[in-house]
Amino acid sequence: TQAHNLVADNPEKLAELQRLWLIEAVKYNVVPLDDRGFERINPDIAGRPQLIRGNSQLLFSGMRVSENCILNMKNKSHQVTANVVVPEGGASGVIVTQGGQVGGWSLYVHDGKLKYCYNFFGIQYFITAADTPLPAGKHQVRMEFAYDGGGLAKGGTVTLYYDGNAVG
């Protein structure tokens, strides 16, 4: 049980596990341990990026984008901006997406061109595509949605950009 001190019976095992913990902690960059309490709450003091600031949100590669964990973009104008690096020979894949089979949106590159798809409950898919391929190199891509307004789910206009230039 937890009331029995296993360390007294197995000091070698304790030393082995302490050593293993330290090896793994170094391997996964968790040392030095940050034992600050209040300071860790403020990203600026803690030395990490602030993921949400005002009406902007910062996402990193591989982050899960759950509906209730990001800014609400429904029924309002908004934009999504991403910095990408396109290899020689082009790129293909998802840049950022939110939602799933029953609704959501995705900003992605397909056939070398930036595309945006809005999935309306699996009933209808609205796709906007760039007119030109995304060239090799570092680029900033952006999707702007201008909401038509006047109530819920009234639609709007999507414009795609490469490095500040409208492409679709």
Predicted regions and their residues:
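Long, internal low-complexity/basic segments
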Residues: 5-90, 161
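Secreted extracellular polysaccharide-interacting domains
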Residues: 57-71, 103-105, 120-130
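Extracellular/lumenal carbohydrate-interaction signature centered on repeated Trp-anchored short motifs
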Residues: 69-80, 99, 130-138
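Short beta-strand segments enriched in hydrophobic/aromatic residues
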Residues: 84-86, 118-120, 145-147
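Beta-strand acidic-aromatic groove motif in beta-rich domains, primarily in extracellular
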Residues: 90-95, 153-156
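Glycan-recognition/cleft segments
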Residues: 94-115
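Short, aromatic/His-centered strand-loop micro-motif at the edge of beta-sheets
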Residues: 120-140, 147-148
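Carbohydrate-binding surfaces in secreted/extracellular proteins
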Residues: 136-168
